[in-house]
Amino acid sequence: YVALCELLNEVAPIAGAKKSILSNSGAEAVENAIKIARSYTKRAGVLCFEGGYHGRTLLTLSLTSKYGLFKNGLGPFAPEIYRIPAPEPYRKPPQFTDEQYVDACIAQLERAMVAQIDPSALAAIIIEPVQGEAGFIPMPKRFLQRIRELCTQHGIVMIADEVQTFGRTGTLFACEQLGVQPDVVTVAKALGAGLPIAATIGRAEIMDAPHLGAVGGTYGGSPLACVAAIEAVNQLRSPAFLAQVTHVGHLMCSELMAMQGNNKLIGDVRGLGPMLLVELVLDRETKAPAPAHALAVIKRCVANGLVLIRAGLYSN
């Protein structure tokens, strides 16, 4: 347990002294992050984003988007959750340039701190650096950096949910490529190499805030899972592995973009490193989603030994 926490503290893209706590799943890691942020700030509000996926426990489901698939019939949900749209460059208004669109998203973020909740009542802003379930959408660097600035200015804890991105984007953490240092980061999935383990890593002064007994669990950080995670982290951060990840990412992206040029059904190819997605649309002008086509493609791929999954708000 201690050896894994020390390793995570070493590699996490967080400024200053760090501490970690282990748990069983990404959802539990996110729950811990919110509890710790609330303990540290003595505030309750949490700002999250449309398209976000943070888990399926009650609190993390409250933070999660895509109502019909994940949330239908499971309310009421946790209070003090505030949600605004996240940047989605592929579907930006056509009159905007890329930079103008990011400006508009930042303006929307700043407006939320007047129209929805005062910054003095916000404990945390939680965001996936690459939104996974929303459709592998990398957040614009400038948008993340503005979140960082606002959190620093108002004493808000910035939480990066890297449960899905950890080890999958060409760097150990996606934040490393997107130019931002969060206060707290959550990791799971690839961390355990198939075994159930997750971690919440953060600035030491924040992690020390909860009272004794406030955060923990019986099975968090089992010896077997810790051994697997230590080996996984060391493999994932090795220069040879990262070089291969970068190579595969470039290869996949170039091949998928070539396919896009020959198939009007492919509206967009996007992601970060080898964490890539193809969005299927009925029409490239209207960008009308094509979920039935996506399901048909997936079934054919699975039948031929290639495992794919659907993602995105429209499952396309």
What are the residue ranges of the model-derived segments?
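Conserved N-terminal phosphate-binding loop of PLP-dependent enzymes in the Aspartate aminotransferase
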Residues: 1-316
